[in-house]
Amino acid sequence: MGTMMLKKLTKIAVIPLAVGAVLTGCGQSSDTTTSNEVAKPAYQEQQSQSMTVSEIRDSAFNIANKIADWQVAQFGNLHYIPESHRAKSEKPNFWIQASFYIGLTKWLEVEKDPELFNYVENMSKDLDYGLLLERPYHADDHAIGQTYIWLTEQTGNEDAYKPTQEHFDWILANKPNVGLEMLDRTASGSGNFHHEGNCQLRWCWADALYMAPRTWLKLSNVTGDPKYFEYADSEFWATADYLFSDEYGLFFRDSRYFEMKSDNGEPVFWGRGNGWVFASIPLILDDLPEGHPSRERYIELYKKNAAALLKLQTPEGYWPASLMDPNKVKTPEVSGSGFITYGLAWGVNNGILTDNNSKEIVEKGWKALKDAIGEDGRVNWVQHVGKSPDPVKKTDSQLYGTGAVLLAASEMAKWQ
């Protein structure tokens, strides 16, 4: 194996955020109706009381282990997922399940659980460390590579990254030449998967920044070849600059949302879409060498996005499915809230967010996530696969929601 690039997680230059500072998954559905499931909701009746730092850390271990065990136990019987997405959810190398593994592997860096580690390793071996190749350029289908390469980092097994490297070499030799505007919808091979538009040959939608860039970065790290992250870094910033709103400090899901308004006349910034991007930045920074020339640029983007998100938490501790229009969907939405809580907690733990307000918001967010977990470990209030702020029921649950809470737990377990 090539010389490993050093992975450094360091305390980063502190720029405090004032209390008043400003601070959307991959899918097919879009619903413009307002959820009416708001009359004295149960989630408002059982809010957790304030916890000590020790209790927060303990709760992170308890919650993460419970939800990880529950989720793994459901594989092969995902009856609770709508039939329209059940078969895809059962595919370990499709983005839905891959998003769970991103959270799980981050948790396994905190909690050294040999049974869960063996599960991840055996799943990966059973797939021969393969990517889905029906959509060779599609970011969603590169997400599982993060888990394969993580196994190389943990075990030294070079076989785990070889198929990803082979495919990424092909992409570098056949770079897509399309713009980032979401235009024509095209069918893919068997019809089991889809493109929303030809621009998805690149990373033209918010979700993509969570799914793919870190895979390319990790590949550079384990091979010692910078060409993979050079490509990913360039593509990340092309998309980030295109979708980020300087006015709001938030990300549009894709170009179709630039001028879109909700029923209440507000701009449409999808909670989970922003969660995908916001969570991607700490994940990238954790793996990015300290001296990399793009490092400060990622940190500055993180600060801008965090400043906006800190202002948008609901009184119950969640982030709205429609960030600028909390009346669009008034119930909790845990996947976006989990990703955002993770990102903010990471900023506090790494000395970027230094004010008490940020810490209080993170603790409130964690308590809200904790309240959304069933006694059996099921993660409730998770918006199903989509691309817009859609209604959510308590019984709605999906693998990426579990992954988001695991990410949050990985930071709350270090809380000070």
Locate predicted features.
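Bacterial N-terminal signal peptides that target proteins for export
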Residues: 3-14
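Extended ligand-binding clefts on enzyme/binding-domain cores
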Residues: 206-209, 214-323, 330-341, 353-382, ...
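Bacterial lipoprotein signal-peptidase II cleavage site
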Residues: 27-34
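CBM-like carbohydrate-recognition segments
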Residues: 48-98, 110-117, 130-145, 151-170, ...
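Post-signal peptide N-terminal segment of mature Sec-exported envelope proteins
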Residues: 34-49
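C-terminal motif of bacterial Sec signal peptides marking the signal peptidase cleavage site
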Residues: 23-25
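Extended ligand-binding groove/face enriched in aromatic
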Residues: 117-121, 127-258, 263-265, 376
